Regions:
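Alpha-helical transmembrane segments and their immediate juxtamembrane cytosolic regions
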Residues: 2-476
């Protein structure tokens, strides 16, 4: 790692070294989804500070007609679609080289969790200091947000562990597996809304709903989606929109595909059948537009920034929300708050044109902050951590034992990450909250994550003997 504070992202070199068979549409979908998330959060955030206490609102709640736009702009499923395709291709290559499930899952988890460990370590220190030094009523609403976006990492790890199952099912059953997943999601919603079962049943959909786009990505990787005529994709898109319109009109579901403050039901947390159908629509749209997207992404002027975004993806995703919190807090401390009012629901709404004018400076400060933080921290996303990446001296377990341990450890990490995303770091490390009838504590979840991470490394990590053999072979 360079001694400079800011290390340039090697975008041009990485773009030039792109393998000719790489699925650029998958990378483009991932980059587009990330940009919408990073830009969407700053646009939607509305903050008021009555008596010095931050109250968080949402621009979409202030103008309900805009919530229909989320039927296009909610593109988080594209992360899972792209990830499902990448996982399928990665597992195929690993399997062809004779690699086992545990070592493959460790390879995926190691790369994903490295920036998360750094994020949690820094945030835990900050949260502890804030808990000790700042008034709880001021700090708590903001510290609740610090881990909110970790839900993605938790859900993604869970569906990544299922990649071999998706691989086998997509090759044998094709799109029937997708219909089965949709049916399971619908059954969970039925149990939740119609049968009156405990709210905790809905937590199953954190796996099932996000498995839908991940499975669709596996279908893409194995050529199944490309085998369908374009008319079929148009029919899927139209049918998906129609089904969701009926579900929202006659069911308990809100219009918005993102969470709204104060709403009794969210399509995002826990996710619902509406979001699962939306994921299928997005997968069909990407398939329908595959040819023009490929041509677009062949252009160096387009492909270079896409490559750059993917190189810093986890850093950008994890750190943009803390930057947003910091900018909002600094603006308030400097007396530069955007003018807001408290709406009928008790949440802040923009107040006149002054809000728009103030937002120009707010967004500019946010963009500069995100740029600086990403440039500062992105090398850590790729730099090995000694306690995490170094080869182990212990013997490798047998493949069956390793597979079960790796799967269980990944599931534990995924579940604990979802727990931390729900609790936030307010009151860290002692605060416990109730979520869907379950007691959750962030410090306990982090401790379990660390233990499960050690188990995953033991099951699939490199060994010292293997590393020495590789070096000897290279020298020869």
């Amino acid at each position: 790692m360079s001694g400079r504070v800011f290390v340039a992202v090697p975008t041009a070199r990485a773009a030039a070294e792109t393998p000719p068979d790489r699925d650029r549409v998958v990378d483009g979908a991932r980059a587009a989804a990330l940009l919408v998330v990073v830009g969407g959060h700053v646009v939607m955030a509305v903050v008021a500070w009555p008596d010095g206490v931050p109250v968080l609102g949402n621009l979409l709640a202030a103008y309900p007609w805009t919530q229909a736009l989320t039927w296009i702009l909610q593109i988080m499923p594209l992360f899972f679609f792209a990830g499902g395709a990448a996982n399928a291709l990665s597992y195929d290559r690993h399997h062809a080289r004779g690699g086992d499930y545990a070592s493959w899952l460790w390879g995926r988890g190691r790369r994903l969790l490295r920036p998360a460990w750094i994020y949690l370590a820094l945030m835990a220190v900050i949260a502890t200091a804030v808990t000790l030094l700042a008034p709880a009523r001021t700090a708590e609403p903001l510290m609740l947000l610090t881990t909110q976006l970790l839900w993605f990492l938790g859900a993604y790890l869970l569906v990544t562990a299922l990649a071999p199952l998706f691989r086998a099912t997509s090759r044998r059953g094709g799109a029937l597996g997708l219909l089965l997943l949709l049916a399971l999601v619908a059954l969970v919603d039925l149990a939740r809304f119609a049968l009156g079962l405990p709210e905790a049943i809905a937590l199953l959909n954190f796996v099932l709903v996000w498995a839908v786009p991940a499975y669709a990505g596996s279908l893409r990787a194995h050529g199944t989606l490309a085998s369908y005529p374009w008319r079929a994709m148009v029919a899927v898109v139209c049918a998906g929109f129609a089904v969701n319109a009926v579900l929202i009109r006659y069911g308990p579901y809100p219009v918005s595909m993102v969470g709204m403050p104060g709403e009794p039901v969210s399509n995002m947390a826990p996710p619902t059948i509406v979001l699962a159908v939306h994921a299928v629509v997005l997968a069909a749209l990407v398939t329908l537009l595959d040819a023009p997207l490929r041509r677009l992404l062949e252009r160096p002027s387009v492909w270079r920034p896409v490559t750059g975004i993917n190189l810093v993806a986890m850093t950008l995703y994890l750190w943009h929300l803390p930057v947003l919190i910091g900018v909002a807090t600094a603006a308030h401390a400097l007396g530069l708050d955007r003018p807001v009012a408290i709406g009928d629901g008790g949440y802040p709404v923009p107040a006149g044109w002054g809000y728009l004018v103030g937002s120009i400076a707010f967004v500019a400060a946010y963009a500069v902050g995100v740029w600086a933080v990403v440039r500062l921290l992105w090398p850590l996303e790729h730099a090995p951590l000694v306690w995490w990446d170094a080869p182990l001296a212990s013997r490798r377990p047998g493949p069956t034992t390793a597979a079960w341990v790796a799967a269980a450890a990944t599931a534990a990490i995924g579940i604990c990450t979802l727990m931390i995303s729900a609790t936030g770091l307010a009151g860290f490390p002692t605060r416990t909250i109730d979520y869907a009838g379950l007691p959750l504590n962030a410090a306990v979840a982090i401790a379990v994550m660390l233990a499960a991470g050690a188990a995953l490394r033991w099951a699939g990590g490199d060994r010292v003997v293997e590393a020495q053999t590789t070096v000897s072979s290279s020298a020869a």
